[in-house]
Amino acid sequence: MTYQWREDGADADLLLDGASQEITVTDTNGTVSTQTWSYPSRTDCLSCHNPHAGYLLGLNTHQLNGDFTYPSTGRSDNQLRTLNHLGLFSPRIDESAIASYLSSVPLTDTSVPVETRVRSYLDANCAHCHRPDALATSFDTRFTTPFDEQNLIDGSVLYDLGVEDARVIVPRSIQRSILHRRVS
């Protein structure tokens, strides 16, 4: 099912069919452009929610392995530990092992290397499609894939967006880097 936010942002409405909407996007240089945002229909579900993505496009262990301040109590604790205490894992996880689990981080967390922040962002926002055997397989943005196996640097792209000799990321060439255009 697809929801579309109302103009005031107060709530979202269920769309029974697919739809598209023109949105205004301002890039990092201040350039304003119009982009079409597509809302998939119910018949489009399996194009993303498929066996290669594990059917569920949701959180991964490494996305939950970090502290979170719970607004209702003001307490902060590791989300995996909290969910374990609430009995939401079956079987329960060994809490002494949590520290050894991978942990992704927010893009804004400047206390960690930029590579970790970018890999965390790409995993959360792109890896449901950009992974082996999925629909868009020219590169792999999963957090767990070693960097040298991701095919991001000078990796080929399926859709060049009209950019001559486009690649996923081209060192020292933001103009030819499709990833920059996609996330801007």
List each model region and its residues.
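Electron-transfer interface patches adjacent to heme c in soluble/periplasmic c-type cytochromes
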Residues: F68-V118, H128-D133, D140-S184
